[in-house]
Amino acid sequence: MAENSVLTVSIVTPDGQVYDDDQVTMLVVNTKEGELGILPNHVPVIAALAIDEVRVKHSQEEDVIAVNGGFVEFSENTATIVADTAENQSDIDVARAESAKKRAEATIRKAQQAHDNSELRRAQISLRRAINRINVSKH
């Protein structure tokens, strides 16, 4: 494999492509096992993603994308992220994310009182997604 100084990063969801850049110097994702930094010429990898931000670095700038689950596949200097949902920082509706956070917190309280574990798990995931969107919007 020839040495290369950049990566290509693509983020897709069931609704279509969210992000595409072929001049990336570093990709940072949070997997179920922890944070993973990918530089050009990294060994091939496939990993399940956590609900968290994805950071895409190029030259002196960094793009931040809220990713809610999925996986990353990297080989031959191309990273493809297939996510359940993903939003660019500039596309996040903060008021909507704050509202979703409040709804999830209320649902968690109700589920705890009712001892409804399945509803509790769903609400906890919704809360993590809302917090992720809020955090990414602040970058």
UniProtKB/Swiss-Prot annotation:
* Superkingdom of origin: Bacteria
Which InterPro entries does its entry note? ATP_F1_dsu/esu_C_sf, ATP_synth_F1_dsu/esu, ATP_synth_F1_dsu/esu_N, ATP_synth_F1_esu_C, ATPsynth_dsu/esu_N
Q: Where in the cell is it found?
A: Cell membrane
Pfam families given in the database record: ATP-synt_DE, ATP-synt_DE_N
Q: How the protein sits in the membrane? A: Peripheral membrane protein
GO cellular component assignments: plasma membrane; proton-transporting ATP synthase complex
Q: Residues of the signal sequence?
A: none
| Keywords, alphabetical | ATP synthesis, Cell membrane, CF(1), Hydrogen ion transport, Ion transport, Membrane, Transport
Gene Ontology terms for molecular function: ATP binding; proton-transporting ATP synthase activity, rotational mechanism
Q: What does this protein do?
A: Produces ATP from ADP in the presence of a proton gradient across the membrane.
- Which HAMAP family does its entry note? ATP_synth_epsil_bac
Give the similarity note. Answer: Belongs to the ATPase epsilon chain family.
* Quaternary structure, from the entry: F-type ATPases have 2 components, CF(1) - the catalytic core - and CF(0) - the membrane proton channel. CF(1) has five subunits: alpha(3), beta(3), gamma(1), delta(1), epsilon(1). CF(0) has three main subunits: a, b and c.
Protein name per its UniProtKB record: ATP synthase epsilon chain
Give the organism the record lists. Pediococcus pentosaceus (strain ATCC 25745 / CCUG 21536 / LMG 10740 / 183-1w)
Lineage summary: Bacteria, Bacillati, Bacillota, Bacilli, Lactobacillales
